Amino acid sequence: NVFESARKCVADNKKVGISIMAEKEIYAVSLTFDDEDIYYIPVYGFVLADYLIEKMTELINTSKNRSIVIDNLKDYLPIFDKTGVDEHSFMDIAVAAYLIHPNNDRYDYEALSKEYMSMLVMSRQELLGKQSIKEAYDKDDDSLLKLACLTSYVNYKCSDIITDILKKEEMYELYETIEMPLIFVLYDMQKFGIRVDKEALSDYSKVLVEKINVLEKEIYEEA
């Protein structure tokens, strides 16, 4: 069982790269937990969307040490509204890459594979053209499979490299204590339609900057 094997990896604090092919609905997932262990599981036959969500939730909630490596996590949080997932389960590789190079234009699997793996891969445009995820899924060729597997593989392969850079640059604590929780805060604001008070937001930004400065000072003093 693919999900059971992935859960064992996560329980041992090993990274599992995942990708979710979804728009309004989930159509497929891909899991990578070794160079040779790359799996694609589409919604098909007895494998229903609810089944995939249930198994993904079980896998995610097995992780307590950011072992689930995903890109653009906020886009996929609606999938888990009913089941619930723990923030500490995830490493958002795109957010981590942004911290390292905030001026880059893109943080997708193609950009990350080139920068951190020195590997050129087919882009989403090359694989899907102008098709949506749903259109590619309905067409039932291997383009969506390739996109899903490339994404989960790059997430998996880049995770340790990017984590090491964050730690070397003394940004990992910032990433873990501020950037990752902020993903869930922003999603909740979006979900519940919280009206943003500009003055309050400005005040919060000042507090956040102060906290970051204190954190940077503590890290510097400990170094």
Model region roles, listed by residue range:
Residues N1-E115:
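Conserved RNase H-like, two-metal-ion catalytic cores of nucleic-acid enzymes
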Residues D81, L112, M122-A223:
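Mixed-charge, glycine-rich, non-catalytic linkers/tails in nucleic-acid processing enzymes
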